[in-house]
Amino acid sequence: MNIKIIGVGKLKEKYFKAGIAEYAKRLGRYCKFEIVEVPDEKAPESLSQAEMDEVMAKEGERILDKIKDREYVYALAIKGKERSSEEFAKEINKLTTYGHSDITFVIGGSLGLSPAVLKRADAQISFGRFTLPHQLMRLVLSEQIYRAFTIINGLPYHK
């Protein structure tokens, strides 16, 4: 089983790196876990809608270049479906049961994900209507993936 998170931008904060490294270590018992960073598109603070669309399209191309045809792709999107930890674990377990051994999660940059990435996604997932920094989302997602595996394996981590 291979789990990959594709994130836009470079993770600079040591505390996020440390947290993700801890969950990556824990996940090593259950899967090959990988985080792939794609460069964010440099843009001024104030953008027109056309400029925003162009930034998202360029970042989207970089994301799509990192996704293989066989991968089951979750796009993290505000309009995605919210799931409980138990529902998420059940879904991951079902995917692996039905032969999806490569699961990829995509976290967009500050403007979100391009329509092309959303179209490629097999499912959209939301962690609520909060706006969170995409760097923090990598840590939260890593923890939820670990939690899903502990639920699947009946371990006491999830209470």
Swiss-Prot record:
Q: Where in the cell is it found?
A: Cytoplasm
Q: One GO term of the cellular component aspect?
A: cytoplasm
Alphabetically list the UniProt keywords.
Cytoplasm, Methyltransferase, rRNA processing, S-adenosyl-L-methionine, Transferase
Classification from the root reads: Bacteria, Bacillati, Bacillota, Bacilli, Lactobacillales
| GO MF annotation terms | rRNA (pseudouridine-N3-)-methyltransferase activity
Reaction catalysis annotation: pseudouridine(1915) in 23S rRNA + S-adenosyl-L-methionine = N(3)-methylpseudouridine(1915) in 23S rRNA + S-adenosyl-L-homocysteine + H(+)
The protein's name:
Ribosomal RNA large subunit methyltransferase H
CDD domains, A to Z: RlmH-like
Originating gene: rlmH
EC number(s) on file: 2.1.1.177
| Species this protein is from | Limosilactobacillus reuteri (strain DSM 20016)
Where S-adenosyl-L-methionine binds, per the record, is at: L76, G108
Keyword Nucleotide-binding tagged: no
Per the record, the similarity remark reads:
Belongs to the RNA methyltransferase RlmH family.
The record, for InterPro entries, names: Alpha/beta_knot_MTases, RlmH-like, tRNA_m1G_MTases_N
Q: List the disulfide bonds.
A: none
Q: How does it assemble?
A: Homodimer.
